[in-house]
């Protein structure tokens, strides 16, 4: 699947510190690397394309864009993979409700997502993979789990073909056989897991499962649903196995960082890690990093609630995407926070001040190759669990002095924060 154009990231001289991230599985901050050889891999779960990109989505993708920029500044070789869940129940339900073909709806929303990401100057993935592009590979992985005894069938009376059965992942068997055990990634207790499973696409009450928390690997074909012929019969993939297979196909093992919103900690990231470990006998990732939830009008912003602030609508209203980006960067990526008009207005004013600060950079006498104290301090803030609010505060304080920026400082704001000063975005 095609991604979106990559913005130019300036190179800035100097010796950036080793970046760190909060690892959900460890409950602490740790280096955002695995091997120390300068090669890093990032997998971030992508959209289910049934509605437009809202500020909550943008906040998550910007968090991991910032991680990439910090890695690149450090000189690392970065491989970034993102999926698109372009066949799933919410997409099919929206397509049915609106009377459009699910494939057309997915294509339309993916294109809008690309446009929003390009406008926000989010670095694109090196591999942008739709689930429909890897159905055969997912089915082969499910077949392998069946062969190993970590997958099993469950009676499916409503299957389109008599005798066809859904396939589930046996969490107890996987935990006994490999490096992963249920709860390793999330740290949640079983009661919390059961509640979240029911809330987030699981089916803990389904009869015939060995454990209520066992997740779906393969959904047998139902009437009027898309299905593919495969090694495990006609049907379509379950949610968690899709990401495990795509990551294992596209990235070195273990993945350096598995990223996404905090609402993916369980069941999605927990189970993806379990599937990958069952297939490889190895831990899936070194760091599990999660962004906080964004609220609007007092509730978590979500498609199901409809309380959305859409990036495309802000852009259509004339808001500079750089101001949107600064509004998001002003929040720590792990924090839960609420979007307000006042927050956006503050960022519009900040952008104007920064643009003015940068306007005379070309006329300064400072050596463009020497980053200086400000750039090093910004690097230190970003290396400390992506402390973008701290980095912004440092820049605000410098701007307030009235001393013009140096060319290297302007380049560093672009390279590290993705804000091209003096260059209004479309």
UniProtKB/Swiss-Prot annotation:
It comes from Clavibacter michiganensis subsp. michiganensis (strain NCPPB 382). Zn(2+) binds at residues 45, 243, 268. The gene is mshC. Keywords: ATP-binding, Ligase, Metal-binding, Nucleotide-binding, Zinc. The keyword Ligase applies. GO terms for cellular component: cytosol. Belongs to the class-I aminoacyl-tRNA synthetase family. MshC subfamily. It holds the Pfam family tRNA-synt_1e. PANTHER family: CYSTEINE--TRNA LIGASE, CYTOPLASMIC (PTHR10890:SF3), CYSTEINYL-TRNA SYNTHETASE (PTHR10890). This is L-cysteine:1D-myo-inositol 2-amino-2-deoxy-alpha-D-glucopyranoside ligase. NCBIfam families: mycothiol_MshC. One of its GO terms (biological process) is cysteinyl-tRNA aminoacylation. A motif ('KMSKS' region) lies at residues 300-304.
